[in-house]
A protein has these predicted regions:
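Extended beta-strand/beta-hairpin segments
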Residues: 1-52, 63-135
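Alpha-helical metal-binding/catalytic segments enriched in His/Glu/Asp
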Residues: 57-58
Length: 135
């Protein structure tokens, strides 16, 4: 199976509790935990970063489709959060609410909902994921 990214995303952490530096092909991102659990809140936490990936992918996918259709929808907003149920096995639910700056028809709404579900990160999160870790 071929890697999707040309270069690995890399991360490091030093002695400062929870502060991580994440590097990708063209930059760096600080990740941290909120102060209420011992971090300094200097960057997004891992859950926020995961949701940001889904937000960015959803917005970009919708923008491509809207532009291709020539629809007058200049701005799209998205809000995401997640919840977890740990009763028998871990179950995570992500809520994603999309709003538009213009009124859209019911037909557009139905189509854009389908397109949002087809964004690559949404499809990735809904399918089987294997994580192989080595030391």
């Amino acid at each position: 199976m071929k890697n999707i990214l040309e270069k690995d995303v890399q991360g490091s952490i030093g002695a400062q509790k929870y502060l991580c530096t994440i590097s990708w092909r063209n930059g760096e991102l600080l990740m941290d935990e909120p102060k209420n659990i011992g971090g300094q809140d200097l960057g997004p936490d891992p859950y926020s970063t995961l949701l940001a990936s889904l937000a960015g992918c959803t917005l970009s996918t919708l923008r491509m489709y809207i532009d291709r259709k020539g629809w007058n929808i200049p701005e799209i907003q998205i809000a995401l959060n997640l919840s977890q149920n740990n009763e028998s096995e871990l179950e995570t639910t992500i809520s994603r609410t999309i709003t538009f700056s213009e009124i859209i028809t019911e037909a557009q709404k139905e189509r854009l909902l389908l397109i949002a579900e087809k964004c690559p990160v949404s499809k990735l999160l809904k399918n089987k994921i294997n994580i192989y870790t080595q030391l």
